[in-house]
A protein has these predicted regions:
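A solvent-exposed interaction/effector surface
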Residues: 1-160
């Protein structure tokens, strides 16, 4: 498992991003099915990952006490009007502002170690304060579009 250092984290000002959101609420064991629905909807809407950024916004712990409490938003950046096409899709925004950014290269299926590094190690030592928006990631490239060792995700911890 990769270990992270303060040199891996940069503070970046990010612009607000309008997104289409498919919410996953409930047992993480069913997340794969939600992801497949999201991919199918996204293809039908013409929002290809190369031209429309992909985000995950984690609204719960990775393993909440009750699986029913698991919550993540699957998002795609778009300025287009949202066509739900029979899916539960809503418009939203990832707010802009200062963020601590940590890039993860390789297997990006489990970003929990990187998120825990930001919260438990980097944040207390940095003198920064977290803002009132959950940690999220932008998936810059992902398997199977690229070989697994070339997958890239950036975690964003919103700061005050």
């Amino acid at each position: 498992m990769k270990t992270f250092t303060t040199d891996d984290v940069m503070i970046r000002d990010v612009a607000p991003t309008r997104v289409a959101i498919m919410e996953h609420r409930g047992d993480p064991a069913t997340l794969g099915a939600t992801i497949q629905r999201f991919i199918a909807w996204r293809k039908a809407a013409g929002l290809h990952p190369r031209t429309s950024p992909t985000f995950n916004v984690w609204r719960s712990e990775r393993r909440p006490a009750s699986p029913a409490d698991y919550s993540v938003d699957l998002c795609v950046g778009t300025d287009q009007p949202i066509e739900a096409n029979g899916e539960q899709i809503k418009a939203g925004e990832i707010p802009g502002g200062r963020c601590a950014v940590l890039r993860v290269v390789g297997n990006t299926d489990n970003l929990e170690p990187a998120a825990l590094y930001l919260y438990r190690d980097w944040l207390p030592a940095s003198g920064e304060e977290a803002r009132d928006f959950p940690i999220y990631c932008q998936r810059l490239s992902f398997f199977p579009e690229v070989p697994e060792h070339e997958a890239v995700a950036e975690l964003f911890l919103p700061l005050k």
